[in-house]
Amino acid sequence: MRKIAIYGKGGIGKSTTTQNTVAGLVEAGHKIMVVGCDPKADSTRLLLNGLAQKTVLDTLREEGEDVVLEDVLKLGYGGTMCTESGGPEPGVGCAGRGIITSINLLEQLGAYENEELDYVFYDVLGDVVCGGFAMPMREGKAQEIYIVVSGEMMAMYAANNICKGIVKFAESGGIRLGGLICNSRAVDFEKDMIEALAEKLGTQMIHFIPRENVVQRAEINRKTVIEYEPEHSQADEYRMLAKKINENEKYVIPTPIEIEELEELLVTYGIAS
């Protein structure tokens, strides 16, 4: 079983990218579990066709310790196993701590013991690489990390920060970076810039996802692009990304860069000039 965590700054399209990629892998015959590690609890919405998924933390708050796996796990598109860790009540507690609680509970309930599982995907909020959000890295819950990024300064800054987290836990947790996924914002020279960033970080840009309105249309209809419009070229982009992840063999401990180098990249490609 391959355990993959998808990180990236908030609003970058991480959950959308994860779910569409998972749909591509499911279509290719793989059995997958998706664990949402974001307090917004939107990591499985498209796979469940908008069905409200009761989060692990909400279930624990309401049911106490008497929780069974079926309470926190729903089957979605193509038999995908879907679960959301959720977050604390607003203004109370730590969302990162909630991720730790959720993953531990899933382990206790035997969620990972399904022998048919080929992949587990963790969809993780990535602006803050605090202890809880770093848990999939820190405790070896995930072995491969992919970072969703775009040609915008803060998305690149977050990607670099996440790489620092990977370096910190690479030896103890055994995790490696599998590559950057560029979710395009149609920034000038974006593809070249992210390829250059990947090179500086010692990794690869595993795929460039073009900006396309069908993604939003599919989301409004609570579906992945692959389910909503399977013949569309954008569906093929996600299939291609799924195939590249499935066949990927380039895993590295990244080499994070200084902020000055990041700014130089932006100047070189004309964004900050």
Curated annotation (Swiss-Prot):
InterPro entries: NifH/chlL_CS, NifH/frxC, Nitrogenase_Fe_NifH, P-loop_NTPase. The reversible ADP-ribosylation of Arg-97 inactivates the nitrogenase reductase and regulates nitrogenase activity. Binds 1 [4Fe-4S] cluster per dimer. [4Fe-4S] cluster binds at C94, C130. Keywords: 4Fe-4S, ADP-ribosylation, ATP-binding, Iron, Iron-sulfur, Metal-binding, Nitrogen fixation, Nucleotide-binding, Oxidoreductase. It catalyses: N2 + 8 reduced [2Fe-2S]-[ferredoxin] + 16 ATP + 16 H2O = H2 + 8 oxidized [2Fe-2S]-[ferredoxin] + 2 NH4(+) + 16 ADP + 16 phosphate + 6 H(+). ATP binds at G8, K9, G10, G11, I12, G13, K14, S15. Its EC number is 1.18.6.1. One of its GO terms (biological process) is nitrogen fixation. GO terms for molecular function: 4 iron, 4 sulfur cluster binding; ATP binding; metal ion binding; nitrogenase activity. Its cofactor is [4Fe-4S] cluster. It comes from the Bacteria. Pfam families: Fer4_NifH. The modification ADP-ribosylarginine is found at R97. Homodimer. Belongs to the NifH/BchL/ChlL family. The key enzymatic reactions in nitrogen fixation are catalyzed by the nitrogenase complex, which has 2 components: the iron protein and the molybdenum-iron protein. This is Nitrogenase iron protein. It comes from Desulforapulum autotrophicum (strain ATCC 43914 / DSM 3382 / VKM B-1955 / HRM2). The lineage of its organism: Bacteria, Pseudomonadati, Thermodesulfobacteriota, Desulfobacteria, Desulfobacterales.
